[in-house]
A protein has these predicted regions:
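C-terminal binding/interaction regions
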Residues: 148-151, 160-179
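Feature captures the catalytic cores and cofactor-binding loops of soluble hydro-lyases/lyases
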Residues: 27, 34-141, 146
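Conserved small/polar residues in nucleotide/adenosyl-binding loops
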Residues: 181-183
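Structural signal for conserved beta-strand scaffold positions within catalytic alpha/beta enzyme cores
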Residues: 15, 119-121, 161
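Short strand-coil-strand connectors
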Residues: 154-156
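A short acidic, often aromatic-flanked loop/helix-cap motif at beta-alpha or helix-coil junctions
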Residues: 21-22, 125-129, 148-151, 168-169
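A generic structural signal for well-ordered coil/turn residues at beta-strand boundaries
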Residues: 9-10, 138, 147, 158
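Polybasic, low-complexity association/targeting segments
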Residues: 1-44
């Protein structure tokens, strides 16, 4: 399986300014029974999106019609906790192609890169600026250019460069699914 090449993405973003989001919050363990990558998006942030009676929690940002997009902007230390490839699958299956944060757990970062989700680590100051701008104007476009390794807030022409392993960058640019490569 391969995924779409990631070269340049311009999209609105969904802000999730919560720090220390772990993989069990991203996809609760009770939904990990499947081994195929499809269907996990329905349970992304399940316990935050729905109450115990399976009713939508209107207050959660993914349930707020003001916000949409292919970019998730998350608080510091996103993807911590147990190694759970399903968390990256859920993010991709939901429709996100990029997650922006000021820090990622290493295993989570690699799982994302392996399945076509670009984790972009930026400075805490720039992350706060993105949160502020997107909160004030949800239709703000964010541009993530992988070739240039640059994130930009399009409407105000503010940007910051980010680092990425050259091998992983090449795989994202070409749409290679690294989770299928076994040595």
């Amino acid at each position: 399986m391969s995924y779409d090449k990631f070269i340049d993405l311009t999209s609105t973003a969904i802000p999730l300014p919560i720090e220390n989001i772990d993989t069990d919050q991203i996809i609760p363990a009770r939904f990990l029974k499947a081994t195929k990558r499809v269907g996990f998006g329905d349970n992304l942030f399940r316990d935050w999106r729905y109450d115990e009676n399976n009713n939508i929690k209107e207050s959660f940002v993914l349930n707020n019609n003001s916000y949409s997009g292919k970019i998730l902007v998350a608080g510091k230390n996103f993807g911590s906790g147990s190694s759970r490839e399903h968390a990256a699958w859920a993010i991709y299956d939901y429709g996100f192609r990029c997650v922006i944060s000021s820090f990622f757990a290493d295993i989570f970062r690699n799982n994302c890169l392996n399945v076509g989700v670009l984790p972009v680590q930026i400075s805490p100051i720039f992350l706060e600026k993105i949160f502020q701008v997107v909160h004030e104007k949800p239709q703000t476009n964010i541009n993530v250019n992988l070739k240039k390794q640059k994130v930009s807030i399009v409407d105000i022409e503010l940007s910051e460069n980010f680092e990425i392993n050259e091998y992983k960058k090449n795989n994202m640019l070409n749409g290679f699914d690294l989770s299928l490569i076994h040595i």
